[in-house]
């Protein structure tokens, strides 16, 4: 998830598609009356079959505009290694793009967009503005994989959701982002520590850390809201959907829900007992993270699965970075301990007016093959939406192994929320979170500040609201 403006790091490119769409993006200008609902009759066509469900033409080329961010573009090039096994001579020509909207908006207006677009990055095109110009992708999930399995059956639950707008599934989000709490397996084993499953256990661990001259947590000023994510994840597990929906819909008193308050009170206790590395609110976030990953002065750190790649140059040798789900407030939560926040990101779209939309869909089918998905995980150290493509050793990445295990253990108990991104609340929320973690604001003050931020958006009639149910 994106946490700070002006950044093209892994979090930026994984941010949920709905964020840009809901904010009334400038991309509405992409729509034109002449192009709306008009599918291209030109371009190569092939005969539909089990191996060619979309009728992509043999020996044709797919123009793909791919966001050149943290994942690069080579993983889409890799599709060429498998495409030919299904449609003879079909090739994808990848064009790396950083500024998606500025470069591709004119092509939508002109009626000649690329065949496939990775609509990611800081300049992502708003989906609502081009919704009628995009192919729906339900038939992709009904098609078979290159291994002969129905695609809908081999992906994680809920992966359609972030790519569905006004009941139209138009964006395939390819990468799974897993959120959890991270620790050094080596350090824990050396000290006989057990990763906490409840907040009470985390408090006990904090006391053990102090005996060793260490801290439980650390935070950096730009990433103080990672603890907001941890708070919300734990609160949703404790209180269930009513907590998630109240926050998503900016309801009055949403931050005062008992489950939310229960976690805030424990966090407040941890701050008062000096279980956070001091000075975090004045420390650049990667330097703060290095205090955990390299100096090992802190035991735990809440983050998304990007953390290993982000800190690979500042992680102690044999750290064995491992993730666990967020802690539960009690031993009888609404959702089990294994439940976690995970979301599909990196949205791919197929414009109707591309020269080869059938080929664009076929490239996506190729990317969902076991071979292509495994290649992505091996080279990018991140899971795709395709289940079962990461080996037991995680290609040597303990973080990747733990992400896969967490997803498998969660089963259908996977949730997500988007209100922070949808309404651009992170910058405002950073202020009270930094004050709270520094000990300058108590739990009551944090609650009041967060509620005021939600209330301001809810009561602003100029802001389009997204009703979540």
From Swiss-Prot:
Gene3D superfamilies: Periplasmic binding protein-like II
Sequence segments annotated as region (Disordered): 30-54
Compartments where located: Cell membrane
Stretches with biased composition (Basic and acidic residues): 35-48
Top-level lineage group: Bacteria
Keywords, comma-separated and alphabetical: Cell membrane, Membrane, Signal, Sugar transport, Transport
Cross-referenced PANTHER family: ARABINOSE-BINDING PROTEIN-RELATED, SN-GLYCEROL-3-PHOSPHATE-BINDING PERIPLASMIC PROTEIN UGPB
Function: Part of the ABC transporter complex NgcEFG-MsiK involved in N,N'-diacetylchitobiose ((GlcNAc)2) uptake. Binds (GlcNAc)2. Can also bind GlcNAc.
Known partners and oligomeric status: The complex is composed of two ATP-binding proteins (MsiK), two transmembrane proteins (NgcF and NgcG) and a solute-binding protein (NgcE).
Listed name of the protein: Diacetylchitobiose binding protein NgcE
Native source species: Streptomyces coelicolor (strain ATCC BAA-471 / A3(2) / M145)
